[in-house]
Amino acid sequence: MESRVGHYYRLDETYRVGREKVREYARAVQDYHPAHWDMAAAEKLGYSGLVTPLTFTSIPAMAANRYLFESVVVGYDTYMQTEEVFEQHRPIVADDELHVDVELSSVRRIAGRDLITVTNTFTDTAGERVHTLHTTVVGITAEDVDPAIKSAVQNTIMHDVNILEIAAADAAYQKTVRPEGEIRIADGGTTRTPGTPSFDDVQVGDELPVRHARLSRGDLVNYSGVAGDANPIHWDENIAKLAGLPDVIAHGMLTMGLGAGFLSAWSGDPGAVTRYAVRLSQPAVVSAAEGADIEYSGRIKSLDPATRTGVVIVAAKSGGRKIFGLATLNVRFS
């Protein structure tokens, strides 16, 4: 796989951000900040349209990455998400039209397993990169899962989707790489005055109010549909156990979306985050009978007076276990 690092392609069609899709995704991640729902609230913060939740880019990224995991990254039975980094160069708003790029950016061998990182870049029609998303997954082979899982998935999953189809190395494979040229990074995320607390009013060590998020199996099914995530480990108990899990688990991206909403509920401005990095440690188990409770807490780790920015650490726990190994958000203060 190392020889395929650098493989790149751009989708032929652009992705247009729909106003109702913004609201639909915000509802799926339980983010009720007014800027995701109400134009007047978004305009008050200086936006030209409804602001997307920070993790919204996972929707077009998942669709764009499908070809990569079907034809370029080969030899694995399934994948487990481990890390995610969102770089918000400027907030994405409704009616933005985005070019979506995909690049296999690294393959690392650690403790006998391959860690595969894919980078998605989102460029607006003005030619400026507005968002960069780095996704790291662990490639899982047949030795790590019950052999019955393949037939179980095929009998359960919707038509035209086969997440466990293992492609072999293709002798006709041809590597395509990112074309050379200047990359222009949008600066809208650093020039707009954020609607966050004043830098002078926050201190290192300040704690964010604790928030609890409840998840049911219905929430997981809804998120699967909204985000286009067909993996049945998020709604089928039998398949989850065949995959070596204790029960159905929440999407890692859903727990990250809840975390981003937790931060913006405190800060007052979802577009004030310039970077959000999460390392997952344990999945959030969602039982059919009781669902799951996820507790989010946070504190200001550091402050930079030169840029009036800070780093906030967010912790997430469910069932007495940490589901975030480490999560940090870089925030602009007013």
Label the predicted regions:
Residues 1-83, 147-273:
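Hot-dog-fold acyl-thioester-processing enzymes
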Residues 81-83, 90-203, 286-334:
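HotDog/MaoC-like acyl-thioester-processing domains
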Residues 88, 215, 280, 331-333:
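Hydrophobic residues in beta-strands and at strand termini
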Residues 247, 258-301:
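Catalytic-pocket segment enriched in acidic/His residues
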